[in-house]
Amino acid sequence: MEKLISASLIGLSQGAIFALMALALVLVFRSTRVVNFAQAGQAMVSTYIGWEVVTRTDNYWIALPAAALAGALLAAIIETFLMRPLAKRASHGAIAPVASIIASLGVLGVLHSGAAMIWTTEQKLFQSPVSVNGIEIGSTVYPFSQADMLIISTVIIVMLIFAFFFQRTSLGLSLRAAAFQPEISRLAGVRVDRVRTIGWALSGAAGAIVGVLVTPGSYLSPFSLDILLVYGFVAAVIGGLESPQGAALGGLILGMSLSFTSIYVSSGLTFIVPFVVLLLILIVKPKGIFGGGNSRNA
Amino acid sequence: MSLVVRNLSVDHGAIRAINNLSFIVEKRRLTAVIGANGAGKSTLLRTLSGLIPASEGKASWGEHNLLKGKAELHVRNGVSHVSEGKSVIPELTVEENLDLGALWRKNKKEADATKKYVLELFPRLGERLKQRGDTLSGGERQMLAIGRALMSKPQLLLLDEPSLGLAPLVVEQIFQTIRDIANTSDLTVLLVEQNAMGALKIADIGVVLNLGNIVAIGPSADLIADPAIRAAYLGY
C-alpha cells in the first residue's frame, strides 16, 4: 500500500513536469510545425535568470514569474529573428522539412555555450522555497516532498490558465485558428505572424516554469535540463504532438510508467522506460492518443 | 467605390496565370467570373485578397490598393474572401468560426449585431453554434464560410467556387442566398465559378476568362444569350 501511494505520488509529480514540458513543445509544433530542440536550452537560460533573481532577492515567488517572462522573451526573439525568416527562405527543396529542426539544434548549442560562458559549467545550487525532504506520516517516510506538491499544484494552475486562455479568450481563439488553418485565419483578419510569436512566447514561459520548478533542491548547469527534452518529447508524442490535452495526459502516463517501474521493478530501468513507451506508442498508435486528422483537438 | 483591375498579370513561377487583365466592378453589382479549370479564376481572387503577389498592373477597391499589404489587413479595408473549398476551420465550433471573422473589429456591439444578421440569414448555423465545423454538411459549411466572411462586415465579397462539391439542390440554394445577400445589402460581390450557368443566372455582370485572358465581358443576360459563349462555356 505504501509502495502504491509512493509510486502514484511520484508519478504525479514527475508527470506534471513532463506534461508542462510537452505542452511547451506542442505549443510551438502546432503553431509553426517546428520540432524545437532548443526548448531545453531556453528553459535552462530562463532558469539561470530565475536563479539570478532568487540569489539576489531570496524570493522564489519573484524568481518564478521573472524566469517565465525571460523565457517568453527569449522564445519570441528566436521565433521572430530566426524561425520566421527561415520558414520564408528555406521553404522549398530538400532542406525545407529539416531546416527548422537543424536550426533549433543550432540554437540549443548556442544557448549551451552561451550559458557556459556567462555562468560557467560549475553547478549552481538553486534553493527550494519549500522542503525537499520526504513527507513523514506516522513512522513511514514517503519519497514525496512539499516541493513535489508545489510542482503539482503549480503545473495544474498553469495548465488551467492556459486552458482558459485558449478556450475562452479572443487571442486564444486566434492562436488555435492560426495553428489549424493559417490561410483562412489570415482571410478572417488574424495577424498570423504576430499570433505565432505569441504562441512561441507562451511555450517559452511554460518551459521556463518547468526549469524553475524542477531545479530547486538540485543543481543547475548548462546541460541539467536536457534530459527533460527527451521526456517532454515522449510525452508530447504520446499525446499526438498537437493537442494540449494530449500533452497533459502523455506527461501523466510517462510519469506514472517511470515511477511504477522504478518502485516495483528496478530503478535501473528508468532510462529505458521512456523509450519503450515511445516505441510502443509509435508502433501501436503512431498518431498518439489525441492525434490525427479529424480527431485533433481545438 | 468600385473594384478597379487594370493590366493585372500574375505569374506562378514561369507560368503566367493571369495575363493583362482589366475590368471594373461597380459598387453593389454582383459579378461572376466564369471559365474552365486553370483559367486563372482562383488566382485572380487570391491576388485581390492579398494572398499572392501580382507581377504587374494595378488593383484597387475605392482608395485601397489591393496589391499592397497582407491579406489580414485587406479584410480591415472591407475586402472579405471566401477561399475555395468551404473555407471553415473544422476543428473549431460553428460559433468560433463566425467569431473569428470579427476578432479584429474593435466595436464588439457592432460585431454582435453582425452576428445576429448572419444567424438570421443562416438559421441552420444558429442551431449548430456549439458543434464542430466538421460535423456540418457541405452546404452548411459553405454557409458558415460565407457567414464568417460577412462577420468582417465587408464591402467587397470575393467568393471562390461556392458550389464546389455540393449537390445540385444545395447549389441552387447557395446561389439564391448569394443573390439575396447582394439584393438586401450594400455588398459588391465578385463570384468565381466553374458552374457557369448557375453563376451567370444570378449575376449582373459576367466575365469569361480563358487561360488568364478575358474572352468576353458584359451583362450576364447578354452572355447567356450569346451563341458562342453558350457553346463554349454553358454546354449547349
Q: What is each model feature region?
A:
Chain B
Residues 13, 31, 94-112, 121-126, ...:
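ABC-type ATPase nucleotide-binding domains, specifically the catalytic core motifs of the NBD
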Residues 34-36:
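The feature captures the beta-strand-to-loop junction immediately N-terminal to the Walker
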Residues 132-136, 140:
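Conserved ABC ATPase signature
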